[in-house]
Amino acid sequence: MATNSEFLIPARADLAAAREEWLKSLKTMRRLSDNTLIAYERDTRQFLQFLTGHLGEPPSLKEIGNLRIADLRSFLANRRNDGAGARTLGRGLAGVRSLLRHLEKRGLVNAAGASAMRAPRQPKSLPKPLTADDARRVVSADGQMAEEPWIAARNAAVLTLLYGCGLRISEALGLSGDALSDPSARSMTITGKGSKTRLVPLLPAVHKAVAQYRALCPFDLSAGQPLFRGAKGGPLHAAIIQREMQKLRAGLGLPDSATPHALRHSFATHLLGRGGDLRTIQELLGHASLSTTQVYTGVDTQRLLEVYDKTHPRA
């Protein structure tokens, strides 16, 4: 019997079923984040749509086995013409390569040449943190733009967690209702990307912001319920916080780079600027590789040179 995926994606039944099996294996065996799974599903769907036009018919496992590097290059060129940047192209190719490797391991195709293609080189861009003063203004409860007091307190609490603990926005919004309920707690355990856990210290300012939100929130914040709620009581979505950050940018005169994630960058950069070591910051951020954390040394050096140029008498 035909499955939904056979109708929803432009592929023959054998390839559609194999792709569905691959997506399930990513979730259960590799435990990738929901965002990565969504991206891989979307990227491989776009790839199959491209192949349908490229080949003149929906591809099957046979066509996948006959793929050449030139076909993948054509796919990337097509995406680039649609406005995709190097980072998007790299992620898209990563999803396609992961699917091809899965099919090879299952003995369904032999696409070793195509699966070995390297991603486009991405230009290295430094994170853009806020200044310490701007970060404090953003997380201040008094500076929030929401009219309802409990929503203003909620926004301040979320933003304080991003800056005060270095959380990803998905990690903050994934907290349970009983999180940070003990005002004497010095730390909490966060489950991040790849289901990896890490210990995050809790500052008094973080406890204070969450406590103010708890006191004003009209919804049940017990264990098993989400800590942060939308206006109607459902789980709070990241888009709401991103929209509030847009209002703060306009109200406080901040640059477009002042996003919720920039608060996490600010957490790392300000720690490094005050003498924090890279290994500790790596653990606090939940980075799997130290090389990911090392980008913040470039930010700190850049700031040091800016201060030097402005203040040194011989500059």
From Swiss-Prot:
One GO CC term on file: cytoplasm
One Gene Ontology term of the molecular function aspect: tyrosine-based site-specific recombinase activity
Keyword Cell division: yes
Residue ranges constituting the Core-binding (CB) domain according to the UniProt record: 13-104
Organism listed in the record: Brucella suis biovar 1 (strain 1330)
UniProt keywords, alphabetically: Cell cycle, Cell division, Chromosome partition, Cytoplasm, DNA integration, DNA recombination, DNA-binding
Record domain Tyr recombinase: where: 125-309
Protein name: Tyrosine recombinase XerC
Family: Belongs to the 'phage' integrase family. XerC subfamily.
Catalytic machinery residues: R168, K193, H261, R264, H287, Y296
GO biological process: cell division; chromosome segregation; DNA transposition
